Regions:
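Extracellular beta-strand/beta-solenoid scaffold signature
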Residues: 102-106, 127-137, 152-160, 181-195, ...
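Sec-dependent signal peptide recognition
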Residues: 2-11
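Acidic Gly/Asp/Thr-rich repetitive segments characteristic of extracellular carbohydrate-active
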Residues: 23-68
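Long, contiguous C-terminal flanking segments immediately downstream of a protein's structured core
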Residues: 29-30, 42, 61-62, 98, ...
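Right-handed parallel beta-helix
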Residues: 87-92, 111-122, 139-152, 164-182, ...
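Solvent-exposed loop/turn segments at secondary-structure junctions
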Residues: 51-52, 74-76, 96-97, 121-122, ...
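Hydrophobic h-region of N-terminal signal peptides that target proteins for export
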Residues: 10-19
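Extracellular beta-strand-rich solenoid/capping regions of secreted or surface-exposed proteins
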Residues: 58-64, 75-91, 98-117, 122-141, ...
Length: 455
């Protein structure tokens, strides 16, 4: 049964003005649902597939307030990184078949962006650098992605954290390149996700070796939420209380055991997601064109029943300018999640039985606790002194603010995400392959360009 999830806490804090706002489009949900984009602005037509110049996509998205529509379809071969201006709406669904695909360089959204039915498949053919995500952004306000497809990155496929009022819904985040030239060697990462009211729902996350996803937490000490004027519907006392992430109804396939994070504090909901392990979780090595290729396994991959790993903030994983967050983890509300192993064993409501903890948490009466030496979580959260340290329970009894999201069971989400996620108006063969592999429990082994992909 479908139901609207809107927490008591969220309802109490939401102002009357916010409730009266108009959604970005029919079906816009989560914390970015009221983004206005280019509403009321000029309609601009993209009339060619050129990288730049009159009629190009790059020219259209330079400045707002604009609504971008497409008279053409096909691949736009970017010649440099693309930064989208503020107050822009991109309606990829207006393109004729087969839709619009952006290639070769990273795409960054701006403030107050609505981006729908767009494919961003970066690749390593034209440019290799350690920060080469397919798409990413931080320190912005008001972004909603709907039915977009992201793949083929050198760093992460899609990283969004330390943004205000963000939604990524019905998107595919898949197939980062395993070893395309990153200075750290083999990478293949999904994304770093977080935000000051951020929603990630009904997304397909697949074929990754790590960060599927990694929750960012408050470890960087970002305080940009204090200047949020457009969507200032909540008031927070500090960046830990402001960090609120809702992760629900997503499908993780062949990325099992790679969800982790939350260092530095925050509130994270993990609700009704479906975690399905793929063949690479049991594969130790394979041979391709006569080459023996190792595949990540063991602790690096995580076990097939893992929901998430709770990460403690340290000098090694957090901002060295903010040691006040060291020793802290996020707090979690975890409910309704399903795991499926490569042997077909399905476990409903795995939830807290699938959570593991970094060293540095505290145990008291059978419960795990995070340090909170400076009372960032506030007096409203019960504290317990353990070994002389003031701590808070990691498990939350009630969900953090969710925005308004139509929520399905994990099993229903699996079917719906495979049917409708990504730029599915004209689903390309790449997304179609991901969905078929998730259904059948299979993978592809391909030698693509310089990066050897093992899935």
């Amino acid at each position: 049964m479908e139901k609207k999830i809107f927490t008591t806490m969220a309802a109490a804090l939401m102002s009357a003005a916010a409730l009266a706002q108009t959604p970005a489009f029919p079906g816009a949900e989560g914390h970015g649902r009221y983004v206005t984009g280019g509403r009321g602005g000029k309609v601009v037509h993209v009339t060619n597939l050129n990288d730049s110049g009159t009629g190009s996509f790059r020219e259209a998205v330079k400045t707002g307030r604009r609504i971008i529509v497409f008279d053409v379809a096909g691949v736009i071969a970017l010649k440099s990184e693309l930064k989208i201006g503020d107050n822009i709406t991109i309606l990829g669904q207006t393109a004729p078949s087969p839709g619009i695909t952006l290639r070769y360089y990273t795409v960054q959204p701006g403030n107050n962006n609505i981006i729908r039915f767009l494919r961003i498949r970066r690749g390593e053919e034209k440019d290799i650098n350690d920060g080469a995500d397919a798409t990413w952004q931080r320190n912005k306000t008001g972004i909603i992605f709907d039915h977009c497809s992201f793949s083929w990155s050198i760093d992460e496929v899609a990283s969004f954290y330390d943004n205000n009022n963000f939604t990524m819904q019905w998107c595919t985040v898949a197939e980062s390149l395993t070893n395309p030239g990153h200075s750290k060697g083999a990478h293949g990462y999904g994304g770093i996700w977080g935000g000051k009211l951020a929603s990630f729902h009904h997304n397909f996350v697949g074929h990754l070796t790590n960060r599927g996803p990694r929750f960012n937490g408050a470890r960087y000490g970002w305080t940009g939420y204090t200047s949020n004027k457009d969507y200032d519907t909540y008031q927070w006392k500090n960046t830990v209380q402001a960090e609120n992430v809702d992760f629900r109804n997503c499908v993780m396939y062949n990325a099992q055991g790679t969800c982790y994070g939350g260092p530095g504090g925050g509130q994270i909901n993990i609700v009704n997601n479906y975690y399905k392990a793929g063949p690479s979780h049991s594969l130790k090595s394979t041979t391709l064109n006569g080459l023996k290729v190792s595949v990540s396994s063991g602790k690096e991959r995580g076990n097939q029943d893992r929901i998430t790993q709770v990460t403690v903030s340290t000098s090694g994983n957090s901002d060295k300018n903010h040691p006040e967050f060291y020793g802290m983890t996020s707090r979690y509300f975890i409910n309704g999640n399903t795991t499926e192993t490569t042997k077909g064993s399905v476990t409903k409501n795995k939830d807290w039985k699938g959570v593991i903890y970094d060293d540095g948490t505290y145990t008291y009466n059978g419960e795990e606790y995070s340090a909170d030496k400076k009372n960032f979580y506030g007096d409203a959260v019960a504290h317990q002194t353990i070994s002389g340290v003031s701590c808070v329970k990691i498990k939350m009894d009630a969900a953090a603010p969710t925005g308004e999201v139509t929520t399905h069971s994990a099993a229903e989400a699996f079917s719906k995400v495979l049917a409708y996620s990504g730029a599915s108006l004209y689903r390309d063969e790449i997304d179609a392959r991901y969905m078929e592999e998730a259904k059948t429990g299979t993978t592809s082994v391909r030698d693509k360009g310089k990066g050897l992909e093992i899935w």
